From Swiss-Prot:
Identified in a IGF2BP1-dependent mRNP granule complex containing untranslated mRNAs. Component of the SWAP complex that consists of NPM1, NCL/nucleolin, PARP1 and SWAP70. Component of a complex which is at least composed of HTATSF1/Tat-SF1, the P-TEFb complex components CDK9 and CCNT1, RNA polymerase II, SUPT5H, and NCL/nucleolin. Interacts with AICDA. Interacts with APTX. Interacts with C1QBP. Interacts with ERBB4. Interacts (via C-terminus) with FMR1 isoform 6 (via N-terminus). Interacts with GZF1; this interaction is important for nucleolar localization of GZF1. Interacts with NSUN2. It holds the Pfam family RRM_1. Sequence repeats lie at residues 58-65, 75-82, 83-90, 91-98, 99-104, 105-112, 120-127, 128-135. Residues 273-300, 697-710 have a biased composition (Basic and acidic residues). It is found in: Nucleus, Nucleolus; Cytoplasm. Residues 24-43, 145-171, 184-211, 234-272 have a biased composition (Acidic residues). The modification N6-acetyllysine is found at residues 9, 15-16, 96, 102, 109, 116, 124, 318, 348, 377, 398, 403, 427, 444, 467, 477, 513, 521, 572, 577, 646. This is Nucleolin. The lineage of its organism: Eukaryota, Metazoa, Chordata, Craniata, Vertebrata. GO terms for molecular function: DNA topoisomerase binding; identical protein binding; insulin receptor substrate binding; mRNA 5'-UTR binding; PH domain binding; RNA binding; telomeric DNA binding. The keyword Transmembrane does not apply.
Amino acid sequence: MVKLAKAGKNQGDPKKMAPPPKEVEEDSEDEEMSEDEEDDSSGEEVVIPQKKGKKAAATSAKKVVVSPTKKVAVATPAKKAAVTPGKKAAATPAKKTVTPAKAVTTPGKKGATPGKALVATPGKKGAAIPAKGAKNGKNAKKEDSDEEEDDDSEEDEEDDEDEDEDEDEIEPAAMKAAAAAPASEDEDDEDDEDDEDDDDDEEDDSEEEAMETTPAKGKKAAKVVPVKAKNVAEDEDEEEDDEDEDDDDDEDDEDDDDEDDEEEEEEEEEEPVKEAPGKRKKEMAKQKAAPEAKKQKVEGTEPTTAFNLFVGNLNFNKSAPELKTGISDVFAKNDLAVVDVRIGMTRKFGYVDFESAEDLEKALELTGLKVFGNEIKLEKPKGKDSKKERDARTLLAKNLPYKVTQDELKEVFEDAAEIRLVSKDGKSKGIAYIEFKTEADAEKTFEEKQGTEIDGRSISLYYTGEKGQNQDYRGGKNSTWSGESKTLVLSNLSYSATEETLQEVFEKATFIKVPQNQNGKSKGYAFIEFASFEDAKEALNSCNKREIEGRAIRLELQGPRGSPNARSQPSKTLFVKGLSEDTTEETLKESFDGSVRARIVTDRETGSSKGFGFVDFNSEEDAKAAKEAMEDGEIDGNKVTLDWAKPKGEGGFGGRGGGRGGFGGRGGGRGGRGGFGGRGRGGFGGRGGFRGGRGGGGDHKPQGKKTKFE
């Protein structure tokens, strides 16, 4: 301590304070470095009661004192010189020696003697030591306020001690980060140093305890956050004036406490977040279990019969047994025997099972029935009929006039339950699906209405679904050909020929169909059906190439899907033949729903259409649907024939062999090697060769067009 006094005398002018702290630093390294920090905090109270006239000296003294605990980046060299020893004293071997020093300096908080008092003596010319006893005028008032601040600071220290105890559990790496953080507070305001130096005493003590104990590894390093928050607050406080020292110190302490409280609350809030995944799993399990309980929407299991009726608008205020009894009584009054009644879980709807289809049809005809004051709604269950059942009672009508309406079709098909016209972009495609109530009604209509004329056009009827695949032309879709077809396909027919003309030629024919264009004229072909395969074969042998109205007809037995050479493998592309020369690719594409591209094959020399083309689709399903809809349809007045196009790579001619080798160049020397075959044209021979090398083999990829070389 004597050396410290000498250093104070050698300082003289307050502005030249740099050298003495270095001496103090060197001496303190040999002694106990943490003792300086404790003396500094106690020496603050000696410097504060100075007069305003001596403010410069007091400030410089503070700079010397604060430097051991903080690495302040102010131009004063004394701070930088005194930082390292303070850190070493707090971090390494000084732990054990600092402990007794604490007992010495603790009462020195109000005694105001060592450390800082000795350093500040030259600035005050000896007035700093008895400053505590000389309470006069303004200085006395400041002393009183300082004592109050000490009380406040002691309360703050208690809060800080709680924080420091938490910091004891931080890992070594976190301890280093926490020690480096206050060292980075280079621009701390001098106003904060009064309270902070007092806090440093407690922090040093807590750090010493922390270094002697093993840190808890499980503790999170997130506790270092308060230091960063404090740095921000202290950087903002630097902009405050020196005259507001006391107020700023109090506010900083309060802010630090508030931040600590907020951080503790945040940590408490973080804990439930960790538990969230577990809770979510439980909730997810509950959510998954919930739908299973709701699957049973209708009381009872499966329908007892195949004849079911949906009953809606029930009085849900009644119980399920009451509703069952009420519904059964209503149908019993109308002479309808009910097999079973199933009520929905909401009791707003239900299903009634009948013994027969006749009872079901009678029930559907009933109107105005009331059950417990509610007029019930009766209809067939939606989705109950399978596609197979609907197809069995549905007919496909083709070659319809484009301007035909549903009302006009209803007049023709009186027994139809539903009529659906097929259109694209608001324009009719001349096709309609006609659904009947029963399969028997569909079969009856098929026999009676086949070939019926509507606005001058003879319509064609086809079954849909599996039933349509097992019938010949009269059913629209032809059966898988067995080799014994009863139908002949007649082509190259005169456009003026009629069904009556053909009936005279084919006397044994049971059905004759001559498709017509929009003008009511023949399209140049016909279908002739006989009672047996033998009759059809006899007509084929006797009438093939016979002239009818000036044209020699051609006959052939109808094969699968209307063509003897039909392709059996579906694909994404349809082959369309029988096109008009005026048909464009755009028209061809628009004629098929779902098509993505269409191309018409043209003659290379004339550029005119060859009468056939291809239509591409995104999937085989789209191609099948379009083929079904356009089977035996028309495009620009011409009857077209559809077939599956073979995928690229199937059949066809094999690729050419490799090109021949190039010729040798002029002049002497050796010729280069010939080109390799299979990839385009052959290569050139090298210059000066007698002859070119041989061409490649012919087992490579097909070669492109030949190219002649001069």
